[in-house]
Amino acid sequence: MRSSLAPGVWFFRAFSRDSWFRGLILLLTFLIYACYHMSRKPISIVKSRLHQNCSEQIKPINDTHSLNDTMWCSWAPFDKDNYKELLGGVDNAFLIAYAIGMFISGVFGERLPLRYYLSAGMLLSGLFTSLFGLGYFWNIHELWYFVVIQVCNGLVQTTGWPSVVTCVGNWFGKGKRGFIMGIWNSHTSVGNILGSLIAGIWVNGQWGLSFIVPGIITAVMGVITFLFLIEHPEDVDCAPPQHHGEPAENQDNPEDPGNSPCSIRESGLETVAKCSKGPCEEPAAISFFGALRIPGVVEFSLCLLFAKLVSYTFLYWLPLYIANVAHFSAKEAGDLSTLFDVGGIIGGIVAGLVSDYTNGRATTCCVMLILAAPMMFLYNYIGQDGIASSIVMLIICGGLVNGPYALITTAVSADLGTHKSLKGNAKALSTVTAIIDGTGSIGAALGPLLAGLISPTGWNNVFYMLISADVLACLLLCRLVYKEILAWKVSLSRGSGYKEI
């Protein structure tokens, strides 16, 4: 007598072959970009170790510093009064290189095999991250060394974002893209959390390991990427996704056989069959200025400039702010700052889900940006009154600040990179993603720089700067929000309501 089919086998059979491959790509690209962000985070945790008040530390017998020197345990050249400017310069060496490199990276991403491009980028990123940490073991105290390493790391890290968004866009169509990418985009926060926790283990001892360990993990992930990444569904005989929501858009003529779900599936399989029999003609890669002409690219790019300014200022300066204002240790401040990223995960998922249901990407971003401004104001004034208020405010601020940032860099970029105005004639995903994220990275460079310059005048002024940037990000979306409201009015006047996603 045979037993019934094992429950685990039923689970495997419940999903199609295409679904398993899509799940693999989603998981792999999630881990890839989590590693990229993990390798960026240690600098924000180690800052409070590079410059610290040493009055309560026990000075070694052979130390040559004067008895009145309260900075003897800090790491030169960050042991002087201008340490904030120097640390801001190190941050900006990475961010400016990243912003410049991003515009170039998208062009290469459209023209080079993504698997090779990503693998090489991760290996080099792991190398440069480790070299920063080796400065501790090699006893390097020259500012130029840390700046050069940050510039090189910023350039090679630009290989990541356009490539992973392009890869996910190749596998997933527009339906539920916001929700799927909202969950997937939590890799940013997961990477930040891992980077904070790993760096926190060694920050009070051998802080060089705070960089070396994430660097090694990133390099290993680069090898895994080379072995397993699949760029296109057609490469493994899977059906390509449908962009622009064709089935819903063609419901006006349901009797047309070409508009049925079956015919769409068959046409996709026909494409796969043709590609498997012989080489398919590759569509031409879009030019930089051609990508700028896609409706919405300029507005969302400029919005992201200010949204990312706010997000990256928190990324690089939040642990130091918590340590200075709430008087936590470097490790405690780093651990507490991870709650901002926890909020970012929630905010990204909520933003994707709401924008899918309403079909209003710009409106979703605008509403969250409007709510973020008063929340940042409240966090600055009451966020450090107690541990409970700090936890709650960090999660709320993280969700409202990172939600729009996550939505623009994922679902919006993928939507615009496969925009119907392209008519399927151009490969634009990587270039559009690079333009949007590259413009945002200019803000990411400006934010920490301005924070470093403004913070000596008081943390209140830093928060006023962040609130101003948040309001500007919101205003830049006004035209697109107006268009979405008009579209909803037309939809409601026809009695159709919102489309079901």
Swiss-Prot record:
Q: Could you tell me what reaction this enzyme catalyses?
A: D-glucose 6-phosphate(in) + phosphate(out) = D-glucose 6-phosphate(out) + phosphate(in)
Localization per record: Endoplasmic reticulum membrane
- One Gene Ontology term from the biological process aspect of the record: phosphate ion transmembrane transport
Q: How does it sit in the membrane?
A: Multi-pass membrane protein
The record lists the membrane-crossing segments as: 19-39, 88-108, 118-138, 145-165, 189-209, 210-230, 302-322, 334-354, 362-382, 391-411, 434-454, 462-482
Describe tissue expression: Detected in intestine and pancreas. Lower expression is also detected in liver and kidney.
Superkingdom, natural source: Eukaryota
PROSITE patterns, alphabetically?
A: MFS
Q: Work out whether the entry's keyword set contains NAD.
A: no
Q: Explain the purpose of this protein.
A: Inorganic phosphate and glucose-6-phosphate antiporter. May transport cytoplasmic glucose-6-phosphate into the lumen of the endoplasmic reticulum and translocate inorganic phosphate into the opposite direction. Independent of a lumenal glucose-6-phosphatase. May not play a role in homeostatic regulation of blood glucose levels.
| Name this protein carries in UniProt | Glucose-6-phosphate exchanger SLC37A2
Q: Which organism is it from?
A: Homo sapiens
